[in-house]
Amino acid sequence: MTLIRTVLMAAALLGASAHAQGVVGKPFGFAAGTTGGGNAAPAAPSDIKELAQWLSDDTPRVILIDKEFDFTGSEGTCADCACCVPSSNTCGSSGQNAIETSFGWCGSSPNVTCTYDKAGTKGMDVGSDKSIVGVGSAGVIRGKGLRLTGGASNVIIQNIHITDINPEYIWGGDAISLDGTDKIWIDHVKISLVGRQMFVTGYESSGSVTISNSEFDGRTSWSASCDGHHYWTLLGLGKNEQITFARNYIHHTSGRSPKLGESSYWHSYNNYWSDNSGHAFDVESAGKSLIEGNVFSNVKTPLTKENLDGVFAVSADDESTCSGSLGRSCIPNVLTSSGELSSAGDGVFSGWLSDEGDLTLMPASQVASYVKAHAGVGKLGAGDYSSSAIPSSTPAPSSSALAKRHGGHDRHGLGHIPHLTEGGPGAWHTPGPAPSWSWRTIGVRSTALPTPSPSSSSCAIGKPTAGPPRFPIFGDLGIF
């Protein structure tokens, strides 16, 4: 009896310690200095209503996600509502149909009706000075994403799994969306089974952001590319935003991993891309990205061929060039069973807009094993972010020196998704028969195309915009 009582007491103390822990580690990269809820006493909300209230209020908080918060059905369903079959869906129920929007996204695509969960189409508003931290492996937010807008700043999102947001439907909802923010650290997060973007920034600058040690799991039964891979992965559109993207695991995707537009600047290092049946990087003319020390395994197209002036993807031949620009040697990328990754656009160096701080990079040969062991939920104790946690690392000097020289429940299988293997890429399908159709422009309607009338459905999402077609950033849907 005494032994049982001792074990129970130890378990209770362990639970209390976990609950009181809050944020683990410190942010690095562009989000260095982010404190979130700071010294606020960690507390766990009792239900989804209290969670939404705490996230959106003006009080600094450390919010513990100590269980699954399931928003499915909490705002009702839209039954028999207006949807369509886009030209990308050539595989029926294994593909993604699209929810019609009030700005007429479906256009002339064949109309169908569908039923979807309303909660997923708009994320929960998150205010400034918040730390949102999962406890152990228990922290799950199901059926609804997080939405940071309107000046929200100083936010930490750590060790949570966001999943099951209308994955059957394009425009079903986003997992994490930023627009007009600053100092955001996203760490040890897992995202899976979403209808639209796993992570997205809007047209207003998202400021200084670090995304680290996170898993973007694209395995799905509703694939826009009709091959079991998720297409809508990472989209950066904010003007002059600066994003450190480090030590993340991006797998089973087919595009937008990431897609960068406007003058979004990404420093992507020590990430592991695996089993991408389409493209990883797609950078628009104003976007900039320094890509170094990453591993691409079974990635069909690591980098699209257009607009390469602002992209520097480091190869073994580029180390001296990088040294002359940054004052250090860059780390070459490694590709296995993948397409080409070749771009030495020096325009990226003039786009380094503020101090990214001192960084620690590891050789690409160590990336795959490190990232698989550390990225995602339930792994906060697997290592910190200091140089001692990463073997054979190479410190990178702060970018201030550069600036001086040069003047960014299982409804769908959670819990029984098979373990990721190292098998080859999924079968490649050319999405859609129309020759003018392009995956890279889906969701971006040319001004030359006719603008259809807004849907009359009471469940249509989004808000119409004035002037030339420009997709809403954060209406009742998220972002394209």
From Swiss-Prot:
Transmembrane segments: none annotated. Residues 386-436 are annotated as: Disordered. It is found in: Secreted. GO terms for molecular function: pectate lyase activity; pectin lyase activity. It catalyses: Eliminative cleavage of (1->4)-alpha-D-galacturonan methyl ester to give oligosaccharides with 4-deoxy-6-O-methyl-alpha-D-galact-4-enuronosyl groups at their non-reducing ends. Disulfide bonds join 83-106, 322-330. Its EC number is 4.2.2.10. Residues 1-25 form the signal peptide. The active site is at 256. One of its GO terms (biological process) is pectin catabolic process. InterPro entries: Pec_lyase, Pectin_lyas_fold, Pectin_lyase_fold/virulence, PEL. Residues 386-401 have a biased composition (Low complexity). The keyword Lyase applies. Glycans are attached at residue 111. Keywords: Carbohydrate metabolism, Cell wall biogenesis/degradation, Disulfide bond, Glycoprotein, Lyase, Polysaccharide degradation, Secreted, Signal. The keyword Lyase applies. Pectinolytic enzymes consist of four classes of enzymes: pectin lyase, polygalacturonase, pectin methylesterase and rhamnogalacturonase. Among pectinolytic enzymes, pectin lyase is the most important in depolymerization of pectin, since it cleaves internal glycosidic bonds of highly methylated pectins. This is Probable pectin lyase F-2. It comes from Aspergillus terreus (strain NIH 2624 / FGSC A1156). The gene is pelF-2.
